[in-house]
Amino acid sequence: MMDAKGRVWITQYVRPNEVPGWCLEGSDNPFADYYPIQHQRESRQVSYYDPETEKFVLIDTCYFTHHLQFADDANDTLWLSGSTEAIGWLNTRLYDQTGDERAAQGWCPTVIDTNGDGRITKPWNEPGRGASFDPNRDTRVVAGSYGLVADPEVGTAVWLSSAQYPGKLVRMDVGESPPESCLTEVYEVPSVLDPMVPTDLTGFGPRGIDIDRNGVVWTALSGSSAFASFDRTKCDVTGPEILDGRHCLEGWTIYPTPGPTIQNTDPPVRADYHYYNWVDQHNTLGLGENIPIANGSNSDALLALMPDTGEWVVLRVPYPQGFFSRGLDGRIDDPNTGWKGRGVWADYGTNAVWHIEGGKGTKSNLVKFQIRPNPLAH
């Protein structure tokens, strides 16, 4: 991901898998003292490439990383997903000032306020089959994390997707004095596991995740091939039922994506596959602001949803070019030239390039999408 200085941030290996001692029990690091990393072999950290110096800068992290996303805050916070036990972040402004990777990073375990006092306190219930549960304590969960996005309305909060069946959205607000102020919420995708949910409103398999400027979260359900939105403002985030994440069905809306269904599936599972999704917050495509778009990875398309009407706009890359997309993003090159100065870019995932017309040696591509305000617009 690119920052405001034009540097490109990457999650990558920067050291052998063994986690440094300062991340573990017995360290004087405040985050390790609060929650020492349990998995002592973590295989990916973070780096950035600076085009001006043409150099990579390697930054060690205590926690495993996978996806990365900047927050819109004064610290240029870089949120990092991937760890099954903690959510991590890097204060890139502090790192630029000091070069101190230990002081600039933090992490928190995913602990839910199951005793309802509005804060997380130790000791807490630990996860695990057969583990005892004390309702007077808070509860740590192994949520897992894949996609993530910062909350534009709450600068200290981040959302993540977990694909553990049927899938969950995880929200962590680190508060004003982390790690002690960190607090996690979990919301399970409505599924056939919950008898309260009608089968036609179920889904599973969130991967991609993004958010609109109003704080509504959008996730593409890669398992059931649907788009789901989640509005936390409709929820009561307290009570004993918050542990299983089924306490806010009213926050969810499921939008089945267009296309054929797989034969003999009940409830119907669509044949398309949505590797990731993105929300066009700033009208880079031309359909308006806050338009959610899913990768139609199995349908040679991007699928844009008009949330006010439920109408789908299918942006198909015509045969025989083929188009197996795994991600997309928007860019405004010139805000003063109308539709010509903006567009959405999507990639060809390299893992299926050899299935595209052309056979062996066929290379991946980028595709630019633009929508004119009318067919004759110039």
Name every feature range the model reports, one short phrase each.
Residues 1-5, 67-75, 131-155, 202-214, ...:
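Structural signature of eukaryotic scaffold interfaces centered on beta-propeller domains
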Residues 7-11, 76-81, 157-161, 216-220, ...:
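Conserved beta-propeller blade signature
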Residues 10-41, 84-110, 160-171, 224-245, ...:
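Short, conserved, GDST-rich strand-edge loop motifs in beta-rich repeat architectures
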Residues 44-48, 68, 86-87, 148, ...:
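Hydrophobic beta-strand positions in blades of beta-propellers and related beta-sheet-rich domains
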Residues 50, 91-92, 173-174, 231-232, ...:
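Structural recognition of the beta-propeller blade-terminating site
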Residues 38-63, 93-143, 176-202, 234-278, ...:
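Surface-exposed loop and turn segments in beta-propeller and other repeat-based domains
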Residues 88, 226-229, 321-378:
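Blade-level signature of beta-propeller repeat domains, shared across WD40, Kelch, NHL, RCC1
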Residues 5, 43, 53, 65, ...:
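Surface-exposed loop/turn positions within WD40 beta-propeller blades
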